[in-house]
């Protein structure tokens, strides 16, 4: 079966490749204790009512039924290693939109499309954990939007790890054809266990000519999670990829969605926020390759660190020799809430073309005690005053999300400020 037939080859690649010598340490991740596959307690279900109560309760806490009532178009819920609930509303399916688990796609009429695109943007040779993903992947989603179709309501997918010492290696493959539009939302969470967990999923997005894709993520993994996810998009002529990313949980994160602007006039927008608390080392950012003329990219991030947390921003902008007339702007603002926390900005630029406009801006600061004093003079407690300031700092990110997800993000920020997320 596709990469599974190459599993031994990919395992050898994984074993032979070195661990990265930059960024956060992953020495605490003992791969000998990671279970690469955990079968859920239920077979595939098409209706919410058919899902067993214990799994249903897990997803209710994630808000899936509520989200469906809000008319979100599709739900794919990954509980440990397989999708156990997947549904696409009839009106979306009637547009010719395909949203299914990737194993079903491999056995259906779109099998050849999956095989043609699977792990082509993120080959197993890309890095050590891409090789591991290629060897042991299971579960995930396949989305295909036909040419000219605009999916007006978001598709969404949830990933939840429930087994201690488990690894989750889901693969999301999204293909949006010429002139089409899609908004895909990914939510991630996991309860806390004493054993380290690993998330090494993969997202591949193909944006057709003059198409537009928005990919939004709210990640709230538990504080024992190593989040080593890989996300990548290829954008054709006149197409647009928009990333909206919120990283709150995990013990360690290395997350840098990459966009390859392959066609003339292709665009990339990245908007992200990272919140690191005690014991967290979150290394996040974005990468872009300008591979065609008149392409543009705009990266805007906010980083927050408290209680000794580390929140680093890492960016990479590459402009190839043929990408004349291209523009790239990178902006990072960091807010440290105490003198024990750390926030660094690590930009990398590889410009191989003269006729381009590239810029980078970074700001690092602390909460103004004068602002806290003013808000307290208006009746707020010190805790509420600081939370309000941090919420205002994050507001440009929140406004890019659908309202229910913006509310969730603001709640996460308030919980993080109180140190009450496990």
PLM features: what roles do these ranges have?
Residues 85-87, 91-380, 394-422:
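Conserved beta-strand/loop scaffold segments within soluble protein domains that form the structured core
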Residues 19-21, 66, 99, 151, ...:
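Residue-level detector of short coil/turn "hinge" positions at structural boundaries
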Residues 17-95:
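Glycine-rich, N-terminal phosphate-binding loop and its surrounding beta-alpha-beta segment
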Residues 1-6, 10:
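Single conserved hydrophobic/aromatic residue that forms the stacking wall/gate
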Residues 7, 27, 48-52, 136, ...:
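Generic structural signal for well-ordered secondary structure
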